Amino acid sequence: VVTSTSIGKLFLAGIIPGILIFTMFSIYSYVYSRVKNVGVLPRASWAERWQAVKDGALVLGFPLIIVGGIYAGIFSPTEAAAAAVAYALFLEGIVYRTLTWKKVINAFLDTGIITGVVFILVGAGQAFSWFISFLRLPQEIMPQIIGADPTQLKLIIIVVIAYFVACMFVDPIVAIYVLSPIFQPYVTNLGIDMVFLGTLVTLQAAIGSATPPFGCDIFTAQLIFRRPYWEVIRHTPPYILMLILATISIIAFPGTATFLPNSALIN
């Protein structure tokens, strides 16, 4: 949104890297469970599997509405989010009949609080971005960083490191609003694909947010799973390493991020 890059193309760009990351995580989890002798769950019967399919069938409507609606040109990203909320209300209120007015009001309140926090962060990020532009810091600092003869690879590495480090300490939304206006002119001048770079930036936001000591996702996981801080971060290094390897793979083979967007009929 900040750089006017197609949301639909960014979704597509993440599919192949997502499969790569999924594969690495799966292999690591399998090896870890074998080495640590974690054990396996009892094999589910075909009846249990079919029941699980029936229970989860309606929930699969969410990715169809959000991703499918955006790809098909039916919804904008904002409209897709609203349609998903309407679908959730339909499932909970009509199909499962578990929705009450108290739950609706609490959901509205929680959403309002989260949205308010996000907008405060976005507003602060935009203000800081304007301040940086006003002081002409990009024009003063960037030439010193990228040198007199910048190349695509050099700039990509600088962008990756900058977003990775920034997202270790602040919310990714703030990092994107602050850093994007600094890098965008140089990215455009060097002809770097914005969808390719957006995929890398999104990945760095995920890595930085999960990196100790101040990654936002660490504290989120701590609150959700109610585990001590040290217990949460103790298991993150292997996954961070795999995400870094995925980043290197995408940089080495840009087609992993650009093939599907370039093949799709999405503006």
Predicted regions and their residues:
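Alpha-helical transmembrane segments of multi-pass membrane transport proteins
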Residues: 1-267
